[in-house]
C-alpha cells in the first residue's frame, strides 16, 4: 500500500509518501512560510501554500521515485488548524482523489504527530506530550481513543513563546539553526524572575505568564525575561506531566510536536525520566515539526482499517480535537 499525505494546517505545506512495510516513509517534502514581520496571517498562508503545493507534490513523487498513478490512497489533514491554510491542502487532496480515482483518507493533524512518534521512537504504551504552536496536550491511548489527561486552558506553549519573541522583536525568524529564538536569548540569562505559575490539576495556563513577562520588558534584562519565561513554562509542563505519570503508572513518556525539538526541554525531560524510572521517547527533529510524512503514515494506518471519506463530505475541521477521533488500528 502506498499513501500520499498532504499537510497544510498552519505555516507548513508538506507532502509525504508512506508504505505499509519498512522503511515506511519514502518521501517527506515541505516548505514553511516565514513572515517578514509579525505573525501568520491566514491570507498569506493561503497564498504561500497555493504557490508551493505543485512543487512540493512533484518533489515528493520524485523522491519516492513513483508516479501519482502508483499511489493507492490520498490522505489529508482536515484539522485542527487555520481555515484558509487547511483549505489549500483539502482542495488539492480532493482534486487528486477525483482526477486519479483514489479514495480519500481523513487525518487529524494531532493524530499524525502522535503516530509518527510511535513509529520513530518505537514506544509501546506511553503517556504522550503533544507540544506545538497550537497544542499543549497530555494524553494516552485507552479504549479506542486518545484520552486527554491535561491540556492548556488558553494558549499553547509554542504559541506563547512565539508571541513573546515576536513582541520583543527577536522574531521572525522563530527558529535559527535549529534553535527557537527564546532558547537563544535564554542562553545569556541567569536570573529567575517572579512570574505567574499556573497548574490546575493536570491543566496549565500560559496567557498570564506571557502578559506578565511582556510587562517586565524594559524593567529587567531581556535575557533574564526569556530565561524565566522558558524555565517557568517548562516547569509547569513537567509538574502536570508528573501528575499524569502518577495517575497512569506509565513507564514510557513520548514527546511529539514542534516544541519537542527544544534541547533545553529535552534535558529537563531526561532528568524527569531518571527520577520516575520512565523511558523518555522523543520524536526525531525531522519529524517534530509539521510534515506530510506523518499525515501519509497516519493515513496508511487509517486506510488499513477502511477509514475513508467521500470527497463531498471532506470538510475542514479547524477545531478537531484529538479525543474526538476513533482509532481502530490500535488495540
Swiss-Prot record:
- Mind telling me which residue stretches traverse the membrane in this protein? none
| Cofactors demanded by this protein | Fe(2+)
Q: What is its main location?
A: cytoplasm
Enumerate the residues binding Fe cation. Answer: 109, 113, 130, 290
PANTHER family (alphabetical): TRNA N6-ADENOSINE THREONYLCARBAMOYLTRANSFERASE
* Cofactor binding: number and manner: Binds 1 Fe(2+) ion per subunit.
Name of the gene this protein is made from: kae1
Q: Look up and give the organism this protein is from.
A: Saccharolobus islandicus (strain Y.N.15.51 / Yellowstone #2) (Sulfolobus islandicus)
- Reactions listed under catalytic activity: L-threonylcarbamoyladenylate + adenosine(37) in tRNA = N(6)-L-threonylcarbamoyladenosine(37) in tRNA + AMP + H(+)
- InterPro entries given in the database record: ATPase_NBD (IPR043129), Gcp-like_dom (IPR000905), KAE1/TsaD (IPR017861), Kae1_archaea_euk (IPR034680)
Instruction: Write the protein's name.
Output: tRNA N6-adenosine threonylcarbamoyltransferase
Q: A GO CC term?
A: EKC/KEOPS complex
Amino acid at each position: 500500500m502506498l499513501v500520499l499525505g498532504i499537510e497544510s494546517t498552519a505555516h507548513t505545506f508538506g507532502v509525504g509518501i508512506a508504505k505499509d512495510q519498512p522503511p515506511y516513509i519514502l518521501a517527506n517534502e515541505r516548505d514553511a512560510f516565514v513572515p517578514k514581520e509579525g505573525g501568520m496571517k491566514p491570507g498569506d498562508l493561503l497564498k504561500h501554500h497555493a504557490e508551493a503545493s505543485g512543487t512540493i507534490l512533484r518533489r515528493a513523487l520524485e523522491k519516492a521515485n513513483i508516479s501519482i498513478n502508483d499511489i493507492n490512497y490520498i490522505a489529508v489533514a482536515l484539522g485542527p488548524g487555520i481555515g484558509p491554510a487547511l483549505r489549500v491542502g483539502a482542495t488539492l487532496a480532493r482534486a487528486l482523489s477525483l482526477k486519479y480515482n483514489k479514495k480519500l483518507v481523513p487525518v487529524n493533524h494531532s493524530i499524525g504527530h502522535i503516530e509518527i512518534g510511535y513509529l520513530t521512537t518505537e514506544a509501546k504504551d506511553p503517556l504522550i506530550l503533544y507540544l506545538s504552536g497550537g497544542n499543549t496536550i497530555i494524553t494516552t491511548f485507552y479504549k479506542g481513543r486518545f484520552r486527554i489527561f491535561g491540556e492548556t486552558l488558553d494558549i499553547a506553549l509554542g504559541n506563547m513563546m512565539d508571541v513573546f519573541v515576536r513582541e520583543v522583536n527577536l522574531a521572525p525568524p522563530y527558529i535559527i539553526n535549529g534553535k527557537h529564538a527564546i532558547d537563544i536569548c535564554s542562553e545569556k540569562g541567569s536570573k529567575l524572575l517572579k512570574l505567574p505559575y499556573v497548574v490546575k490539576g493536570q491543566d496549565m495556563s500560559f496567557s498570564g505568564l506571557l502578559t506578565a513577562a511582556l510587562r517586565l520588558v524594559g524593567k529587567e534584562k531581556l535575557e533574564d525575561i526569556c530565561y524565566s519565561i522558558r524555565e517557568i513554562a517548562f516547569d509547569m509542563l513537567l509538574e502536570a506531566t508528573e501528575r499524569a505519570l502518577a495517575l497512569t503508572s506509565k513507564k514510557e513518556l513520548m514527546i511529539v510536536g514542534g516544541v519537542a525539538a527544544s534541547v533545553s526541554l529535552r534535558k529537563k525531560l531526561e532528568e524527569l525520566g531518571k527520577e520516575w524510572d520512565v523511558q523518555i521517547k522523543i520524536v526525531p527533529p525531522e519529524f517534530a515539526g509539521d510534515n506530510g510524512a506523518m499525515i501519509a503514515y497516519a493515513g496508511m494506518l487509517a486506510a488499513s482499517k477502511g477509514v475513508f471519506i467521500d470527497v463531498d463530505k471532506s470538510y475542514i475541521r479547524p477545531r478537531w480535537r484529538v479525543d474526538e477521533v476513533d482509532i481502530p488500528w490500535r488495540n
